[in-house]
A protein has these predicted regions:
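Short acidic-glycine-tyrosine-enriched beta hairpin
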Residues: 81-97
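A short hydrophobic beta-strand segment most commonly corresponding to one strand
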Residues: 67, 93, 107-119
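Glycine- and acidic-residue-biased ligand/ion/polar-headgroup-sensing regions
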Residues: 64-76, 80-81
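Short beta-strand His + acidic residue motifs that chelate non-heme Fe in jelly-roll/DSBH
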Residues: 58-59, 77-78, 94, 99-106
Length: 119
């Protein structure tokens, strides 16, 4: 067993962030706090991802299901068919192979915990 104290986990910049459609607020940024260091689990990857106002992941897909637990702010999640607003306490289940994006709304930051299968 291991207790991870989030306040002690390094915040690492993520090189890419994509603005939400219609964003005019300049460059957008996001950061990651790896909850489980690489190789710490045979089965899971988990991080906290922090999005500044208007920042998203851009369209992407995973080789496994993904769980997002919204921990701060207000954001959006979208697949090719719909967009939905998410806020603190919401949990999102994204299927393996589902093209999607997630991030902050233009007027709010957003943070979530992400859980995927280790590859």
């Amino acid at each position: 067993m291991r207790v991870i104290r989030i306040a002690e986990v390094d915040i690492v910049p993520i090189d890419t962030a994509t603005p939400i459609p219609g964003w005019t607020g300049g460059p957008v940024r996001r950061t990651r706090q790896p909850i489980l260091p690489e190789g710490a689990s045979k089965h899971f990857n988990s991080s906290i991802v922090n999005f500044e106002k208007g920042a998203t992941t851009g369209w992407h897909v995973h080789k496994s299901d993904q769980i997002l637990v919204i921990t701060a702010g207000v954001g959006m999640v979208a697949n090719e068919n719909e967009e939905q607003e998410v806020t603190v306490g919401d949990v999102v289940h994204i299927l393996e192979g589902e093209t999607h994006w997630h991030g902050a709304k233009k007027e709010s930051y957003m943070s979530h915990i992400t859980i995927t299968a280790a590859e």
